[in-house]
Amino acid sequence: ELDNGMTLAVKYEADNDEDDAGAFLDSHSITLSSDEMGSLTFAGHGGASNMDNMDDKTPNAYEESWDGVAEADEETIPNGITGNNSFFYTAPSMGGATFSVAYVPQGETATPNGAYMDFGVVFKPEAVDGLEVGVAFGETEETAGTTVDEQAIYAKYTMGSITAGMN
């Protein structure tokens, strides 16, 4: 932590799981943050988007509700685009609302036809402990000239060790 309250975090995932032969480091990112400005993350690999963060917030024992489904692929699942060399900004919370934006530049494997950007809002009202509501929206263009609007909306409530929610 710096004297002005800013923090700098560097993360590496050392698991030898990168597609490149012999690559030891997989996901990696650097984040600059402070209470006043929020946080800005640059992900060289393994970045996230708002749609990816909010696509399945309902409690479940498996990572995603569609895991293990044979026909579930990127074209049918509304989870936005993640990619290398991406940016993710999260503003500081204002009255329980947190705004964020994600950007993946054109030319990355995940964005062959143009840059990708999505937006998200998460609201955790201070008057209702345990309630969380979120919405994210973005537009993808996996096929040139064909855009697809995607949205993810969720609500969940946690009381003690019990969580109920819906997407």
Language-model-detected regions and their locations in the chain:
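Outer-membrane beta-barrel proteins
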Residues: E1-N167
